Amino acid sequence: MKKADILVLDFGSQYTQLIARRLREQGVYAEILPFNVSLADIKAKEPKGIILSGGPASVYATDAYFCDKGIFDLGLPILGICYGMQLMAHHYKATVAPAGHKEYGKANIEVKKDSALFKNLPKKQTVWMSHSDKVENLPQGFEVLATSENSPFCVFGNEDKKFFALQFHPEVQHSEFGKNILKNFAKYACNCESVWNMGSFAKTQAEKIREEVGSDKVLCAVSGGVDSSVVAALLASAIKEQVIVVFVDNGLLRSGEKEQVEFMFKNTLGIDLISIDASEIFLSRLANVRDPEQKRKIIGNTFIEVFEEEAKKHKDVKYLAQGTLYTDIIESSVVGASKTIKSHHNVGGLPEKMNLKLIEPLKEIFKDEVRALGLELGLSKEVVYRHPFPGPGLAIRIMGEVNRPSLELLRKADVILLEELKSTGWYDKTWQAFCVLLNIKSVGVMGDNRTYDNAVCIRVVDASDGMTATFSHLPYEVLENISRRIINEVEGINRVVYDISSKPPATIEWE
């Protein structure tokens, strides 16, 4: 079992993933586990500290989430955040009740006592609150470390036990020194060293792959995106002669994608590539399917079938490698009390029975860590910084049924969007950019004639790890040129709209 410096117990907060991400940025390996993980599993991880995340429940409610009480007797430093703070207070017999004044948004705190958390930090700070309950009295043995206008017990702790509790969320960017607070907890309370990096990760994963695979062969599924490219490079660094890299044209790719992928692997990466045209089978199975979850599961099942057929042609193939990321695992609701957002074609969308064992060497890291790993493995910046492209491809960028005419419309619009972003220098400034073909038509006027054609939506977002995202503030003239070109050059589209929603509440992809 992989060891972790700090374990984050997930009580259902939308920010739980950010806690782990912020710690990893400091070189500390943090791992997220369900709130009800067993004490034995916690001990097996040999952590140096534990963090209790926030969550939507109330500790006094009948449906409250509780972890094993034994964690408070392990002798490990513990940091409670929001719900985790209230859980700690509740455990030590303090009263937690509904707050008369709920706090959502920015607040100012003032540090009242020096502690490991606030070492070398200002006395006054801006933080991010998101709570509707409050701690009414201080737990016995604890003392106040910081206050806010509405929270006299905003931060409290027991320095001897190294237990700390925060009413605010240090993991979000709005908390001015939140990242420093988490770093201080790891460094001064838990005695963690900053040794986690992609160099050490690559070495560990290569050893793990060799140990798990032995002399067997591995089919590596690639799409041309950064995730699968990094997986292929990592496998090649560990067991090059045992890796069979397979690219499947599922008919759901962007314009020119197949040719780009084949060139990249054979010429840029120096990796032999088997290319399979399975577009007919994918598109036939997607016919008349409109539900996005069904699309994902059909695509996931069909991918596996295609790979299993290819595996039969090669002796000793026992494994299938995929570029599943930590964000995929999280959004498919594998950990904690979080709700399922959507199944990913390479997680929840997979069939229950597989004749190949699955190997996912990136499933413990975030997108920006994948990019860093790619550079560590020698991949070019051109490959590493390509915009993310989903496994289900254009199928989840077409609202409703997927068919060849719709795919052709979407491809043409997408080419124009990317051309304009690259020519204006905006492509490299953004996290992801694509078009969505909406399942609606609208009235227009072109050349004095009435039109009734398709609408397309432009989605361009800024992000660092894909867990949260904001829409990109593209200049109006750039948007205008994109819209004008799509409407003039793509027959069948007469309206272009821009998606200005952020994640959360929206996801980056529409389906």
UniProtKB/Swiss-Prot annotation:
Matching Pfam families: GATase, GMP_synt_C, NAD_synthase
Database matches in InterPro entries: Class_I_gatase-like, GATASE, GMP_synth_C, GMP_synth_GATase, GMP_synthase, GMPS_ATP_PPase_dom, NAD/GMP_synthase, Rossmann-like_a/b/a_fold
Enzyme's top EC category: ligase
EC number(s)?
A: 6.3.5.2
Question: Which molecular-function annotations from GO does this UniProt entry contain?
Answer: ATP binding; GMP synthase activity
What are the Glutamine amidotransferase type-1 domain coordinates in residue numbering?
Answer: 5-195
User: Where ATP is bound, by residue?
Assistant: S223, G224, G225, V226, D227, S228, S229
- Positions annotated as active site in the UniProt record: C82 (nucleophile), H169, E171
Domain GMPS ATP-PPase, which positions?
A: 196-386
What this protein is called in its record is GMP synthase [glutamine-hydrolyzing]
Q: Please tell me the species this chain comes from.
A: Campylobacter jejuni subsp. jejuni serotype O:6 (strain 81116 / NCTC 11828)
